Amino acid sequence: MKTKLATMAVAAVMAAGPVMADLVFPSLSYRTGPYAAGGIPFADGYADYFTMLNERDGGIGGIMTKVPECETGYNTEKGVECYESTKGQGALVYQPLSTGITYQLIPKATADGIPIHSMGYGRTSAANGDVFSNVFNYPANYWNGASGAINYLMSQGDIAGKKIALVYHNSAYGKEPIRTLEELAKKHGFELTMLPVDHPGQEQKSQWLQIRREKPDNVIMYGWGVMNQVAVQEAANIRYPMEDFIGIWWSGSENDVLPAGDAADGYKALTFHGVGNDFPVFADIQKYVVDAGNAAGAGDQIGTVLYNRGLYAAMLAAEAAKTAQEIHGTADITAAMMRDGMEALEITEAKMAALGLPGFGPEFNVSCANHGGPGLVGMTQWDASAKTWSLINEFAPSDMDVIQPLIDEDSAAYAAENNIASSCK
């Protein structure tokens, strides 16, 4: 009843009030540089979803949305400049799409009262909303991904005494899962080898020669951009079994496997959202966006992994904005109100189905203490002949007995260093 009344109040305000400014969702994109192949489809999916809401629904709560893009080139300094140049436009939330940029923006955005959603990337301990009041990383983070990979391997057989290699991008991003995997190695008795790959990742011969020599039972990869396709090709060159090779969700797009052709068949990647275009929402994207000539890109990325991820990020932002409108009884929300909407966000299967995205992601609730969601992780596998990803393992829990103490420890250290008081009542 409360929700109904709030929705009616929003509608009443809209009917009686003046024309309001757009709801602004800046896109810190990278359509250029070594990571453009990943940045472009995400930015397209993010923009196209909001365009669909404008064309089909008249925006959110009767207010049109606007997605100003600022090109970062995946460069941290440029990312900060983009934030500074767009925050005054009424920005409601930032999706930096870069762990390096996210780390730099956390203190700035928190001071400015603007929320950050670093979905499946960024600073993992930001899941602790008591410390990171303005940062959210639901529905899953890097440490959930590391645990999800190990849980999947354990579901296939005992991993005690097995050798597992981590091939990782030698950056803040790539180093994120190391501590979690070290703790999981202690807990489950597997041997962990770490193989860093320097930016941008085009040279990996030494790492894969070491893998050929040491013959690990499994390889887990935290890569991005050209690093991924080079790794898949190098694995094929040494005839490493693709079914034993698992990428994090940033190493599991079509870009990463297509260059290797049939040799990539069987490669696996973690995910926290649906794959493919067999969802009703895509008919509306086609009708209101692509066919109408409003697509952010060429319209040929629909249903690809990273387009879907951008669309999913936009959907979660839009649903948080609706929640904020209901909480505050106004359609013309501020960044502070948006933060409240993100913290009260509930994603149910019924809601996803109503949005044309049935089963697209896990059900989850956000709270003051938990900005990270449930950490449910699925597994996908590449079929090279069909050129499709399939979900082979449903969204399943990660080991929070290991992960939560690490989140608590890291966030407590951050709070002490930065003199941050508890934000949850």
Can you annotate each of these PLM segments?
Residues 16-18:
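N-terminal signal peptide c-region/cleavage motif recognized by signal peptidases
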Residues 22-42, 97, 163-169:
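Short beta-strand segments enriched in small/hydrophobic residues
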Residues 24, 37-47, 56-129, 138, ...:
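Beta-alpha junction/loop-to-helix N-cap segments that form part of ligand/metal-binding clefts
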Residues 72, 116-118, 123-127, 200, ...:
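Venus flytrap/periplasmic-binding-protein-like
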Residues 78, 124-125, 133-239, 276-283:
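Extracellular/periplasmic Venus flytrap/periplasmic-binding protein
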Residues 86-99, 115-119, 163-168, 194, ...:
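Periplasmic-binding protein-like
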Residues 235-314, 410, 421:
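Extracellular/periplasmic periplasmic-binding protein-like sensory domains
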Residues 296-307, 318-393, 398:
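Segments of small-molecule ligand-sensing domains
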